[in-house]
Design a protein with these regions (language model features):
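Short, acidic/polar
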Residues: 86-91
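Active-site beta-loop-alpha junctions enriched in small/polar residues
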Residues: 12-16, 71, 108
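A cross-family glycoside hydrolase active-site/sugar-binding cleft signature
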Residues: 10-12, 68, 104
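Active-site neighborhood of glycoside hydrolase catalytic domains
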Residues: 1-18
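Extended catalytic-interface subdomain
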Residues: 67, 71-75
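Conserved protein kinase catalytic core
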Residues: 18, 76-77, 112
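Carbohydrate-interacting/catalytic domains
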Residues: 3-5, 23-31, 35-57, 63, ...
Length: 465
């Protein structure tokens, strides 16, 4: 490499001699057979030691390793690792460790036929395992688009996972970052359940000085330093687990003091991305969310906050909405060809609104209390308005439908009244009457701009699905 500096040197180094080829021979890229062999055999301590020894010598060497799970000289990946969590756990390590990840022929498709260099054609008529391919699309490929976070070693930190005073050698834990993007990876390469804490990284070598004054120092960083967190009671760390899509929140100060806790089932892997720190708001929402969630994840922190703030409102809304929506759906979508008369429909609507009166009054009273200083009609008045609107909608929907015009927009502009407008629009939106019935339930709040604040659209979707 010194004699021909512009040459890229690639090596296929087996028998666990990768370090020799990189350190002594100066190869730029080397097949890392230790990755495949040790992880396949679950020799986890050996492989963790190899990583720790490498970063103690020179972390930059990790960038030169080509990590793989199979190649033309080895059995296929599915033959060695299967198609379940162990395969995807090791594959996650492969694409999130520094270095160059390499997929073998047919690995993603789950092919089982081994191809040597002498093969000129396939002898098995194999088809891709679509479930395996789909899981790659969900678990693996999105992380590959984030390779800029994982590929380099400048911010790579490797951790021991401590549990009851000892290190669990079966869990791989490391963090990395690029710019303001951070990630933490955990994988338990054993069937047994495992848990523990990470706080301080394993030591790694750093070259300091220049010229003849260059020397190597051993350094270590905490997970809080690796994620650039603050030792502040008012700061919170928010992150997303890639595979499940769950969001988590932790106190930044707690991570600084204790580190990060992880509990993994056998062969379970978790990748935390979109890690960022926030300062608590005046209403202490992040503190309340952190205390309420108690470490568990949720799919949307904003929705979780809404559910906490509007718990009583949503309970009264659910009691009202679930008592009327199924009945309204039945009225607007009759299962028989025999259409009821207007008088019969009025009778059905009256029976429905009478049956839900208590739930309706309770909802409108509760919602008015939540509205605070917004001027709104009294609960009884809103209930009466709802009954009138619902009757009008049901009767309108029962009329002979309008013929769909060639130009709907032009026809809407020419509509002579509200009823004509609705009937014309319904030719392109069959669900319109049910949507308007929902509007009838919350009309006063929608008109006052409260429906969006209280996320009623989301709540209605829960009851329609």
């Amino acid at each position: 490499a010194k004699e021909v500096p512009d040459t890229l040197l690639l090596a296929e180094a087996f028998w666990m001699m990768e370090g020799y080829f990189v350190r002594t021979l100066g190869m730029h890229r080397v097949y890392n057979s230790a990755f495949m062999n040790m992880l396949k055999k679950e020799e986890n301590q050996k492989y963790r030691d190899s990583v720790k020894n490498t970063i103690k010598f020179d972390p930059q060497i990790l960038k030169r390793y080509v990590n793989f799970m199979n190649n033309p000289d080895e059995d296929t990946a599915v033959a060695q690792f299967g198609k379940d969590d162990k395969y995807f756990g090791v594959c996650t390590l492969m694409i999130t460790m520094p270095g160059l990840p390499m997929f073998g022929h047919g690995q993603i498709e789950g092919f089982t036929e081994k191809y040597g260099m002498e093969f000129t054609k396939a002898y098995k008529n194999e088809t891709p395992d679509q479930n395996l391919v789909n899981r790659h699309w969900h678990d693996i490929f999105p992380l590959m688009k984030k390779r800029y976070i994982f590929a380099n070693v400048d911010n790579f930190l490797f951790y021991d996972v401590w549990d009851n005073g000892g290190v669990n050698e079966n869990i791989f834990a490391y963090s990395n970052s690029c710019g303001n993007e951070y990630a933490v990876v955990f994988y338990n390469n054993k069937y047994d359940r495992a848990q523990g804490w990470i706080k301080q990284s394993c030591e790694y070598a750093v070259k300091v000085g220049s010229g003849d004054e260059t020397h190597t120092e051993m350094r270590s960083k905490s997970i809080s330093e690796g994620l650039n967190l603050s030792y502040d009671d008012n700061k919170f760390c928010i992150f997303k687990e890639h595979r499940t899509g769950l969001w988590f929140i932790r106190r930044s100060k707690e991570i600084c003091e204790k580190g990060m806790f992880i509990a993994l089932n056998g062969f379970e892997y978790q990748v935390y991305t979109e890690i960022h720190e926030v300062e608590d708001t005046a209403d202490h929402r992040y503190q309340i969310l952190c205390d309420t969630l108690q470490g568990r994840g949720c799919y949307d922190l904003e929705i979780e906050w809404q559910e906490l703030c509007y718990r009583d409102l949503y309970q009264s809304f659910a009691a009202f909405a679930t008592s009327v929506i199924p009945e309204i759906h039945g009225m607007l979508n009759p299962v028989t060809d025999e259409k009821p008369t207007a008088a019969q429909l009025k009778k059905q609507v009256k029976a429905l609104v009478d049956s839900c009166k208590n739930a309706a009054i309770n909802f409108y009273t509760t919602a008015n209390n939540f509205a605070q200083d917004v001027e709104l009609p009294e609960a009884e008045k809103q209930y009466t308005n709802f009954a009138k609107l619902l009757e009008k909608l049901v009767l309108l929907a029962a009329e002979k439908p309008a013929k769909k015009p060639e130009d709907v927009m032009a026809a809407l502009k020419k509509a002579k009244d509200t009823d004509s407008f609705i009937k014309t629009l319904a030719t392109t939106k069959p669900e319109l009457y049910e949507q308007l019935a929902c509007y009838a339930i919350i009309k006063s709040y929608a008109d006052a701009g409260l429906s969006e604040r209280w996320a009623f659209e989301r709540k209605f979707n829960e009851y329609f699905h």
